[in-house]
Amino acid sequence: FRPFEFARGMRRATLVTSGFVHADMPHLLFNMLTFWFFGPPLEGRIGTPLFVLLYASGLLVSQYGSYRKQRHNPDYATLGASGAISAVLFAYIVYWPTSTLILLFLPIPIPAPLFGIAYLAYTWWSARQSRDRINHDAHLGGALTGLAFVALFDPQAYGRAISLVTG
């Protein structure tokens, strides 16, 4: 996805197709492992139609930050499913707030809500730094999309999550 070209009416399909291409094998592997761990239980919980809508929304909405920031930069391009995967992960966290997550590179169990807060803080900070080749705006946009999606389609889930965490 090239925001500069998209803003000028060119290569519009890349808004979607870029979500099916990854920079390298570790990028693809990490996204697909995350999807494999969190996608099936979430799909079972919300149903296939809403799951597909969540994934598609995460993919599309997560590009907005990149678009806003990079639409005047002809050299910027981004790809990968990380925004959609972040949407799935954060919807999962709302539905299973008492679960623990274990990062592959840091094998320490982390409570899901704590992971979510740390992830949001880190991606927000990293998006402001722009020091690496990771699209932190897409990660942040996807995570927020997942949270908003649950609020829109199952607002009672937040009350259940709070009760589970505090109860």
Q: Where are the regions a protein language model picked out?
A:
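A detector for small-residue-rich transmembrane helices and their helix-helix packing motifs
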Residues: 1-167
